[in-house]
Amino acid sequence: MDLIPNFSMETWMLLATSLVLLYLYGTHSHGIFKKLGIPGPKPLPFLGTILAYQKGFWECDIQCHKKYGKMWGLYDGRQPVLAITDPDIIKTVLVKECYSTFTNRRRFGPVGILKKAISISENEEWKRIRALLSPTFTSGRLKEMFPIINQFTDVLVRNMRQGLGEGKPTSMKDIFGAYSMDVITATSFGVNIDSLNNPQDPFVEKIKKLLKFDIFDPLFLSVTLFPFLTPVFDALNVSLFPRDVISFFTTSVERMKENRMKEKEKQRVDFLQLMINSQNYKTKESHKALSDVEIVAQSVIFIFAGYETTSSALSFALYLLAIHPDVQKKLQDEIDAALPNKAPATYDTLLQMEYLDMVVNETLRLYPIAGRLERVCKTDVEINGLFIPKGTVVMIPTFALHKDPKYWPEPEEFRPERFSKKNQDSINPYMYLPFGSGPRNCIGMRFALINMKVALVRVLQNFTVQPCKETEIPLKLSKQGLLQPENPLLLKVVSRDETVSDE
């Protein structure tokens, strides 16, 4: 029996031509960086260099930074990705040329209504949404919202105290994941949930389902390898995000808005109410107001931006304090002096606590939750002699920048003093980017920092954390998604009341 099919010459020619065209499609962009003299790992047809991410984005970036120096080229499938680490070029991309050339982030496939979200929207639509949301995140508004955040620190302490009697190590992700979810649902949707003790609550279930994301998901991979499929999926109403989850949040926001309009609950201060209020502002151009769909999109993106980031950052902070007891003691001393007898934290007090600020900054240097920043180049441009073609994704490897010994002596060491007032002038602002920089930086930066700080203060007023036999030292990082521990981060939590009585 013949192993080779008995095709006609025309069929063989058609097959050969199809294979050649398919190969050219899968590789035609892969010569861009070679032509520009930019080094980088060798790409494979269709896949590009994505196999380099098998150990995690951050590990790939660290290794490339060591091997190739200030810049290198990658290919996510066929998409050229230019990594830059020069602070002057970073400043140009994030700040100077943000509005003209580097306005947009990369869009990863079909996202449904979330294309209206501030993190994903583009060009003039992004500018309009950013302008409408910016007043929501001012210091004044956050100060008004602070009591909502602060009430959940009491729940946080209660949940931590419940676990003390069991004699088991405490999972930081469980504790801070619940705290983060409680704050997000309260500030974004006006819903109060003790999520640790109410895991069956529909908000908890839907949020957890929403956050289950894998870069090797078949749909995500298909649009990475074949970007032309994105508009097809859009037309078919197929999204990377579960339809039932988006439908749940859409219905919830509509119902809450209707109830609040009936009750005329203008005095309520949370993100949802502030967005509803913005629809009623008297503006010269009525189309500038947020639509109901845009309000849903912002509420959902707040979950994405706030849940995993806050819970992971707090987990990393407690881990670092546990393995550096001298730093923990110094921070507790500052807290006790500023807030004697476990007095409740106030917004203004938190802003005045210098060592707390140093600890948070150093935590975010070692573990920047968004390990990369990205901007899409809208037109051919030359920056400081570097030519960047239109359509290139310019990537800033934050994790690698924060570990660069040229800017951070002994970068693996946890030293909050790097961020003291005495040393602040020596820090290049474009080498420390936990929240990005420029007009498209993280709009929720102040909210995230105050959220972290009030939780740390409340926990350290009541407890001391210590490593235990189950604590993984050094910490291994997950290869998936945002920066987070690969395994559960377990610590021993000791009540400070016990510590004092023992002394």
Swiss-Prot record:
Membrane association type: Peripheral membrane protein
Signal sequence residues: none
Induction context: P450 can be induced to high levels in liver and other tissues by various foreign compounds, including drugs, pesticides, and carcinogens.
Any one GO MF annotation of this record: iron ion binding
Reactions mediated catalytically: an organic molecule + reduced [NADPH--hemoprotein reductase] + O2 = an alcohol + oxidized [NADPH--hemoprotein reductase] + H2O + H(+)
CDD domains linked to this entry: CYP3A (cd20650)
Enzyme Commission designation: 1.14.14.1
Keyword Signal: no
Family statement: Belongs to the cytochrome P450 family.
Described function: Can activate aflatoxin B1 to a genotoxic product.
Name the UniProt record assigns to this protein: Cytochrome P450 3A13
Organism: Mus musculus
Encoding gene per record: Cyp3a13
